[in-house]
């Protein structure tokens, strides 16, 4: 029998018989590992431990101590949910039930359930876990599988598409329950130590709105009850900080079904924050030698064909028919910037050329994936594009990373960094890739940045450095990026005249400091829990007159503080209620103004952190706030140490 080469994570090659399973290889490495094997990761894909190896592969054995074990456990938990559902609702029809980053979901139809029904389903699931049912894999003839699902068009659709070329398909059974599934799964339902159902939402089959509407039930699972409790507590904290909740409380933004899903409407308070964010990044760009440009929201599709986006992204684009000519809302800003560069003749002395734009883009995400500001159809990217000589790459990337680090420091955000290298399919020669990767890695080393190398995870057009924000709850969000691009200059035939009087191809660098304004707005809202630093806060100071007689004096103070965002609470409330409301509204500074303050020409200041008041001179307060805003401090500091 022929053999295949299995390469282990440490690089060790093993010659095994073709058709050997993941579990067979584990036993060949050692009997203890074989006994502990739960699944395998074959060429990056999580598979069942009984999966046959028919070609040379890279293999990682998954045990209970592996990160991937949680995915396997949650996949089995999805089946436990489905079994519990069918025990309680015999008409329930199952579609798909994958694991996710935080748990699992299962899309169902045939029954009408809501959040109130989850408790009973969860209780039945706990019974199934208590029964400790063996989970067994069975290979079934594909035609037989069609017969088993003669009343389930969704499973038949899977058999006709994903399994179209398979003679046999796998089913997993536990007790009376069975499901068409590729796996992998744990050995028994009793391995699930903590199980919870979380929420219900609507979904569409295959994620397409024209298909059947389904009910999606989300859940999670852990090896222990303690781990589940910790997750649920973290989830509770996250719900308290949910930017959608805070956005409504603070009148920051809204999303209205009348205007369309994934199309946020920024209210005055939200727009004030956006303006500050935009001014901040514009200042950084100008200081770094960028020129601001502007491109339209829509282009003829000829541009998108030239850039390659039409070929690769057309399904995610919003297309328009204008006088029998096709246009597309822009999904990215880079083709417009490349076109601007294309308008001029450039010498090697002119480079680098740096453009920036707060450019609105549009991407047709699946409706079920839209969520607040984290996933939208319309969003704004603080896009920067640099056109550089190959010998300028390292210097420009270093300067860009410096700006990114300054930005993260300004907002007091921790971060992680990934360095993504050349994928199997790529454009550009070996020499330029090797040099570019070396230059990017050199920048990270020079900045003493801890990073993870993601082998083969770069874009097809160049390597990249990705930063991920870490918020106050330890969650990670996509953030700044620096990407080299050898492809677009080629597609647009961009060039500059070199010192040798010959035409040369520049390298394009894509760069964003926030990623997108929408996601960054979301991250900041949840990171600060709505308590924005004074320089960002939509309302920086609220004046609280003790009585209506003090309103005129408050108006005079408002005029003196006209460089700041100041409001007057003129409702006929008690001072205590006014203070409490200002705290609830997360206003950084509150100034109580009564007869004593008016007679003395002072104000009584308190901040949202300190619960005591200090009588001070208006000019002193103004001077401090000017410093606090100019230095973009992340906390209220006026009363600290006074």
Swiss-Prot record:
Residue ranges, annotated region (Catalytic): 242-533
Residue ranges annotated for the TGS domain, each copy included: 1-63
Localization, UniProt: Cytoplasm
Reactions that this protein is recorded to catalyse: tRNA(Thr) + L-threonine + ATP = L-threonyl-tRNA(Thr) + AMP + diphosphate + H(+)
Ranges that cross the membrane: none
Entry-linked Gene3D superfamilies: 3.10.20.30, 3.30.54.20, Anticodon-binding domain (3.40.50.800), Bira Bifunctional Protein, Domain 2 (3.30.930.10), Threonyl-trna Synthetase, Chain A, domain 2 (3.30.980.10)
The entry's keywords: Aminoacyl-tRNA synthetase, ATP-binding, Cytoplasm, Ligase, Metal-binding, Nucleotide-binding, Protein biosynthesis, RNA-binding, tRNA-binding, Zinc
GO molecular function, one term: ATP binding
Binding, Zn(2+): 334, 385, 510
EC number: 6.1.1.3
Free-text remark on how the cofactor is bound: Binds 1 zinc ion per subunit.
One Pfam short name: tRNA_SAD
Matches recorded under SMART domains: tRNA_SAD
Cofactor (UniProt): Zn(2+)
Keyword Ligase annotated: yes
GO cellular component: cytoplasm
Enzyme class: ligase
Role summary: Catalyzes the attachment of threonine to tRNA(Thr) in a two-step reaction: L-threonine is first activated by ATP to form Thr-AMP and then transferred to the acceptor end of tRNA(Thr).
Cited NCBIfam families: thrS
Subunit description: Homodimer.
Entry similarity comment: Belongs to the class-II aminoacyl-tRNA synthetase family.
Protein name: Threonine--tRNA ligase
Source organism: Haloarcula marismortui (strain ATCC 43049 / DSM 3752 / JCM 8966 / VKM B-1809)
Biological classification of the source: Archaea, Methanobacteriati, Methanobacteriota, Stenosarchaea group, Halobacteria
Protein encoded by which gene: thrS
